[in-house]
Curated annotation (Swiss-Prot):
Residues 5-146 form the RNase H type-1 domain. Its main location: cytoplasm. This is Ribonuclease H. It is found in: Cytoplasm. It comes from Coxiella burnetii (strain Dugway 5J108-111).
């Protein structure tokens, strides 16, 4: 485990999809001082990007009070969307540079509300590259998919 600063929440999030669209899951690993919490969930029909956004939203929603947070994701869509693209989309009336509607606007709006409560640093790591905490988040996201598929088979 990497050395972590005291009194900062470390949030590792990942989304996964089997088929795109298809059954999807999200996973979150939270670390704060000596405490650790794991969260996951799934949706029967979704996209990978929707699950990436949902993972970040659910992780931030789980924090009871405003915090300093370091969010680590393997999704450039999530990291660049929240740090670079969102203000531009809003200025353009939720349109892309091609004048098309921004995909997943309701999720982006929800994420923005959650982000506003905290002081956040966003980090990107390459997926499936041996980053231990990101691998745990990936396992949790896949657990979310497995649970959705299991419920569907019953």
């Amino acid at each position: 485990m990497a050395k972590q600063e005291q009194n900062i929440v470390y949030l590792y999030c990942d989304g996964a999809c089997r088929g795109n669209p298809g059954p999807g899951g999200w996973g979150v690993l939270l670390r704060y001082n000596q405490h650790e919490r794991q969260l996951h969930g799934g949706v029967a029909n979704t996209t990978n990007n929707q699950m990436e956004l949902t993972a970040a939203i659910e992780g931030l929603k789980s924090l009871k009070k405003p915090c300093q947070v370091v969010v680590t994701t393997d999704s450039q869509y999530l990291r660049r969307g929240i740090t670079e693209w969102l203000p531009v989309w809003k200025r353009r009336g939720w349109r892309t540079s091609n004048k098309k509607p921004v995909k997943n606007q309701p999720l982006w709006e929800t994420l923005e509300r959650e982000v506003e409560r905290h002081t956040i640093v966003w980090h990107w790591v390459k997926g499936h590259s041996g980053h231990a905490e990101n691998e745990i988040a990936d396992e949790l996201a896949n657990r979310g998919i497995d649970e959705v598929l299991k419920r569907g088979a019953q």
